[in-house]
Amino acid sequence: MGRSVAVLIQKFLREKGYILDLILLACLVFFLIFWGWNFAVKFFTLLAATFIILRRIDYEKHIWLKRGLLVVFGIGAVSFIIIEALVFTQLGSKEEERADYVIILGSGIKGTELSLTLKQRLDASLDYIRTHPQTPVIVSGGQGPGESISEALAMKNYLVDQGIAPAQIIMEDRSTSTQENLAFSKKIILASGLEHPKIMIVTSDYHMFRSKYIAAKNGYAAEYGISAPSPGYLKPINMIREYFGTVKAFL
């Protein structure tokens, strides 16, 4: 049974594999439009190119190559399952512990307008911020292409519009990645005289595991989290993208 399925797959790839090639190329165009040329898209491009090239190899003549590829793809599949399981553990994170600082991670703006993802992160933070008016809030995000102001300023403006006191908000407006979000925010906290801060991270549900992991690498005393819901139609793509981001964080 297993051998017959393998034969059918090989026949499909040999005769209709160009369909998969076109699907991969369409996905690449989609990713470039929405995400730009970032690590995840580069990694996907490498995988897609590898698949397209390897599909044209006669594995009956190169059995050693076939076995090697099976090992590589097996490791990839196992790592994907493990990492996605870890990501799932933090999807519904909504911790209530008292933190020394709240850190809201940026997620892109258009001009001066918040992206839907960033608005959801800010909305998710409001209950905690209002309940802890003495806890400083760091809004973290620099200014990227197509952004008229920094993400930090856009976030501060939104929180102030929601009734949060400007004095409670601290802007970190240089970061361009999750690593920089948390590293630059820690410098701000250390400058205040607090050496071992406990932080409440606010970010998207799919992004929480990686954010906590990177925060731990940056030496925070404790990392709590409030996960913001992400659009359902983008969840599969975000989860796949997060796999690549987490692999990069582990390296």
Regions found by a protein language model. Name each.
Residues 1-99, 188-251:
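Extended hydrophobic blocks
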Residues 82-241:
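A structural signal for short, hydrophobic/glycine-enriched beta-strand patches
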